[in-house]
Amino acid sequence: MHHTPPEAKFTTLTLFGISSGNIRWGLAQMGTSVPKLKQVPGLLFFKLLGSGRGKGFSIKPNFRRYGLMCTWQSKADADVFLRHSPLMQEYQQHTDEVWTLKMLPYQQHGLWDGQAPFTPVLAQPHTSGPIAVLTRASINWRALPGFWRFVPKTSQALDNAEGLIC
C-alpha cells in the first residue's frame, strides 16, 4: 500500500512595529487578541511574541515590536486571515510596520505548551534558500545569571551574522 506523507504545517511569522501613539494598545493585544485568534478558521496553533530591546536579548522589553507566530490548516486559511481578518485590519491601523514571513518547517525540537506545532515537517531536507530559526525557552531563575553572562557575546555574534533581520 502506498502512503503519502502528510504535508508540512504551513507557518507564518508576522512582526509588528507599533506606532508611537499606540504603545499601550500594542501591549494590551498580548491579552485581548487571544480570544479573537481562537476563533480564526484554519488556525491550528498561535503564539503572541514580545521582544527585548536591541537584538532581543534584553531584560528591558521593546514595547514597539511584537510578533505573531501561527501554524495553519492551509496556505489559503493563512492568506484569508492576513488579508481580510478584522484583527489584522486593526493591527494595520495601529502599526507603522507589518512584515510576514511564510514558511514550511523542515525541523522541530521540543514542545510549545505541550504541543509540537510544526509537525509534520517537510519530507525532503532543506537544500537552498533562506532559513528562519525560531527559538523559545523558559529559563529557570537559578540559570539566569549564566544566561545573561553569554548575552554580550551572543549579541556581538549577531552583529556579524549575514542576513540577520532585527
Spans of model-derived segments:
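Short S/T/G/P-rich N-terminal loop/turn motif that feeds into the first structured element of a domain
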Residues: 1-57, 62-65, 75-81, 96-165
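Conserved RNP beta-strands of RNA recognition motif
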Residues: 68-70
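A common structural junction motif
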Residues: 86-95
